[in-house]
């Protein structure tokens, strides 16, 4: 801005001298120079827009054809909004750290401010809160200011708008959105520290494209690196989304340890309490009735949401798998019906007739197929940090998860089910496994955590009951790591015993109801709490509705374990090992392929050993184990109970 003012001053000064000289010579009256308005279109703006591809939307963007520089023209109104900036991998030459479709960094909540010379990008803090009408608000605001993440020089003006050059931010290796993982010094202690490292190659990097829409801007850039110490090239196409967050905030719901939701912690500063109030709010989608249906909803009628949750399924999935992936997605409608909504979750193929569709665009939630050797799937979601509202979500489906599903089904049920005694399952068997895996990951995208204690609520003997298993499957929650029925014995399948998890468990339906049902007359999270507590109290006596948190750093509570079934791991393990002995006796016969190497036999032998080891590990936590329970004041029970001596001796 100083340069612009200085140039204007010099221009006026020189012009006045020229006109004075002419006046003396020609004796003509000198006219006053035209005043240049501060916010008028200037020469710098014309320079920026010349030969640029101009797109209008959230901001007007200019991508110059020659230099490939990217400019944002930011209207004055934009400085009153809050935004989310996401950073996703669109393509990669190396899947060591990321696969295509995966978020490379956590989304950043940002806002913009400006002065006479610069536009500042601030990182907005949301973990501390205050009511702006509280007397302490002014002091709070001074002590929790939003730090500046980046400053951009104003290079031009257009009336009330300012123009900034964002080329280096989106086309360079900006640390806060770099595809090179930033690791903490403690990473190696927890199995990390092996991420790719490299030197940015600016000459092999570029901004590829920009798309601008009313509420978002989508930018693709090619970033290249030379990795160390092997000196290998590494290139990624990154997709950045700048998305304006809603001005009307979603109603927040307080988290409760007795129902497993992902959540965000906040600290409430207030002058009405004697301390800072810690609060935790669940992550959930904004599922609300249409205004005209609100009365019907509170009368108990099923209504459609104002905005459904739509998942687009990658057409890279083989058709025979894509169909059941979509079924697994829409299985969750049963749970939302319990909360009073119908047709909440929809599954569609990637659209072929929408030129604006991009699976990396923040507006679209997608199930993406990643052709890698990783044997896994994951379902991350991305929230408005202010409220916990889930804005978008993805399921990353790694190609080799198929081998994981195959191996589980073989080692857990081959002793009782002759359909899985082969290297390649029939379509109907694999489709059942895929549907379960898809539904599990969608559960995460809806806000649900793993419920590792769910399967412990089932008596071991019940898992050999046709009536019980046909009704409940292997677990009351598909958010548990409770796979296939390894407790069933030869002959049980023919009697009608079910070998697989349910489409949804009773806990899953209950949890969605608890998290998404609207409560009439409760206009604050605190007013909801009494009703939410009553819903939990109603189910308290039934262990099927208990939540067991995942134990990450070692298993202390034997009732909250992964890959387990039933309420007696010793008895369940004995039955399971009987089945493993049957499999070992027939392994070569069931995997026989004349003329083939023994690779498949060896692989399945390893899988049997792994399954055997799981059963041993399920018993180990009983020795010195503690059962934890979420207890509230006034309840006649203990928060922790040591495993009794007799059970510990039996486990040994």
Q: Where do the language-model regions lie?
A:
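Zn2+-dependent metallopeptidase catalytic core
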Residues: 79, 318-344
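Stable alpha-helical elements in mature extracytoplasmic
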Residues: 321, 325-328, 430, 434, ...
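Auxiliary tRNA-acceptor-end handling modules of aminoacyl-tRNA synthetases
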Residues: 24-317, 344, 350-404, 409-427, ...
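Conserved catalytic/binding loops enriched for acidic/polar residues
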Residues: 455-652
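Extended catalytic-interface subdomain
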Residues: 378, 383, 389-397, 435-446, ...
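Sec-exported extracytoplasmic/periplasmic mature domains
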Residues: 330-341, 443-444, 448, 484, ...
